[in-house]
UniProtKB/Swiss-Prot annotation:
<feature type="binding site">
    <location>
        <position position="197"/>
    </location>
    <ligand>
        <name>NAD(+)</name>
    </ligand>
</feature>
<feature type="active site" description="Proton acceptor">
    <location>
        <position position="333"/>
    </location>
</feature>
<feature type="binding site">
    <location>
        <position position="367"/>
    </location>
    <ligand>
        <name>substrate</name>
    </ligand>
</feature>
<feature type="binding site">
    <location>
        <position position="268"/>
    </location>
    <ligand>
        <name>Zn(2+)</name>
    </ligand>
</feature>
<dbReference type="InterPro" id="IPR012131">
    <property type="entry name" value="Hstdl_DH"/>
</dbReference>
<dbReference type="GO" id="GO:0000105">
    <property type="term" value="P:L-histidine biosynthetic process"/>
</dbReference>
<keyword id="KW-0520">NAD</keyword>
<feature type="binding site">
    <location>
        <position position="421"/>
    </location>
    <ligand>
        <name>substrate</name>
    </ligand>
</feature>
<feature type="binding site">
    <location>
        <position position="136"/>
    </location>
    <ligand>
        <name>NAD(+)</name>
    </ligand>
</feature>
<feature type="binding site">
    <location>
        <position position="243"/>
    </location>
    <ligand>
        <name>substrate</name>
    </ligand>
</feature>
<feature type="binding site">
    <location>
        <position position="426"/>
    </location>
    <ligand>
        <name>substrate</name>
    </ligand>
</feature>
<dbReference type="GO" id="GO:0004399">
    <property type="term" value="F:histidinol dehydrogenase activity"/>
</dbReference>
<feature type="binding site">
    <location>
        <position position="426"/>
    </location>
    <ligand>
        <name>Zn(2+)</name>
    </ligand>
</feature>
<keyword id="KW-0028">Amino-acid biosynthesis</keyword>
<dbReference type="InterPro" id="IPR022695">
    <property type="entry name" value="Histidinol_DH_monofunct"/>
</dbReference>
<keyword id="KW-0862">Zinc</keyword>
<feature type="binding site">
    <location>
        <position position="265"/>
    </location>
    <ligand>
        <name>Zn(2+)</name>
    </ligand>
</feature>
């Protein structure tokens, strides 16, 4: 007999619901002192010894015998070879996904703009791509080619000159799909290094690894901690927490569909979070039964069970309006609106990384091939953060061109404000350009 699921049940009508929800959502992401110190030691070694440190750490952590950095560089020809080593079906899927991701992200491109004022002053904004971006890809047989597409393609669409990928190959394990994805996405250089040492190499550069402007991509606690420490030296995408899915359902979707949607995130790792919110108590019972029945069929059943029972929940609400309130409170990475009329509720959704509309739009489609990016804010950071996109690989510069007349008029305002802040150098710099003799005579000060 199958043991019923032990997934947590919450009711928004409970006076202690807010406290229980806060406890459900809590997750400690801060590295412990030992991890922090190890990462700092690794970063220091890479900064001081460059390639030699990378070779040493690769031998130590990845179990590889390499003589030099030359053994840790994959040429373009090796990426092209990977395309021939995957199945035709896999290549077709990668190419189709890449095409859709590229098409979606093309629409995110920002253009420079300017306008001219009556006196000839020109104001504007110049959009410039980063020179070089670093992409971290987890290694081994469990690595994810979809992450290569989602990180590299927006960078190339943005116009980044060079995309540098690092991917460890523990015990020599190479994922041909990852290399094929890198080839299709247009990755320029690949180094088979990983961990905190790879992040340090990208941030500071070595004899072989070029210094980049931004580091993106997922990784373990050492990678995440290293990204925290190098932030400021380089930009980073985000410090991602465990994967999350929140399903809001009106009770009319097939319970098996919902259970499997919850599993789709729970199978990532034991800390992943899968939550269902519905006003239909009977439907919640049906989904619980589906979870119990389907769980033994999962390849990663142990991981799914730990995640579902440890951090998952079925939440009963009074109505759909309250379901949306709960969704906004959670600010999930992935939000499925599995309802009859998702468009009606969309305007009320304020906080979510990605919103999946309707019963047929499973989160898995967005993970792989719908087009929008699957690198999304987690741990409630959707309240102030956005999905990875082209804009993460572009920067903006303000453009100011003052005509003589414009400089004279703006100088008057700048002078008053600068002297109000007791910054006479600022004031006099502006005043030198004022051509109005009446203003100059009336505002002459000692030392001017």
């Amino acid at each position: 007999m199958t043991t019923p699921t032990a997934i947590r049940r919450l009711d928004a009508a409970d006076p202690d619901f807010a406290r229980h929800l806060d406890h459900l959502l809590s997750w400690e992401s801060v590295s412990d002192d030992s991890v922090n110190q190890r990462v700092l030691d690794i970063i220091k070694a890479v900064r001081e010894r460059g390639d030699a440190a990378l070779v040493e750490f690769t031998q130590k952590f990845d179990g590889l015998q390499v003589a030099s950095m030359a053994d840790l560089i994959l040429p373009r020809e090796r990426l092209e070879l990977a395309l021939t080593r995957i199945t035709p079906g896999q290549r077709e899927a990668l190419e189709k996904a890449a095409e859709r991701v590229r098409s979606y992200h093309e629409k995110q491109k920002q253009d420079s703009w300017s306008y001219t004022e009556a006196d000839g002053t020109v104001l504007g904004q110049k959009v410039t791509p980063l020179d070089r971006a670093g992409l971290y890809v987890p290694g081994g047989k469990a690595s994810y080619p979809s992450s290569v597409l989602m990180n590299a393609i927006p960078a190339k669409v943005a116009g980044v000159t060079e995309v540098v990928m690092v991917v460890p190959t523990p015990r020599g394990e190479i994922n041909e799909l990852v290399l094929a994805a890198a080839c299709i996405a247009g990755v320029d250089r690949v180094f088979t290094i990983g961990g905190a040492q790879a992040v340090a190499a990208l941030a500071y550069g070595t004899e072989s690894v070029p210094k980049v402007d931004k580091v993106v991509g997922p990784g373990n606690i050492y990678v995440a901690t290293a990204k925290r420490h190098v932030f400021g030296q380089v930009g980073i995408d985000m410090i991602a927490g465990p994967s999350e899915i929140l399903v809001v359902c009106d009770g009319q979707t097939d319970p098996d569909w919902i259970a499997m949607d919850l599993f789709s995130q729970a199978e990532h790792d034991e800390d992943a979070q899968a939550i269902l919110v519905s006003p239909d108590a009977e439907f919640l019972d049906k989904v619980a039964a589906s979870i119990t029945r389907l769980l033994p069929t999962m390849e990663r059943a142990a991981i799914v069970e730990t995640s579902i029972n440890g951090r998952g929940a079925l939440i009963k609400v009074a109505d759909m309006a309250q379901a949306i309130e709960v969704a906004n409170r959670i600010a999930p990475e992935h939000l499925e609106l599995s309802v009859a009329d998702p468009e009606a509720w969309l305007p009320q959704i304020r906080h979510a990384g990605a919103i999946f509309m309707g019963r047929h739009t499973s989160e898995a489609l967005g993970d792989y091939c719908a087009g929008p990016n699957h690198v999304l804010p987690t741990s409630g950071t959707a309240r102030f953060s956005s999905p990875l996109g082209v804009y993460d690989f572009q920067k903006r510069s303000s453009i100011i061109y003052c005509s003589p007349q414009g400089a004279s008029e703006l100088g008057k305002t700048a002078s008053v404000l600068a002297r109000g802040e007791s910054l006479s150098g600022h004031a006099r710099s502006a005043e030198y350009r004022i051509t109005d003799p009446d203003w100059t005579a009336g505002n002459k000060e000692d030392g001017k």
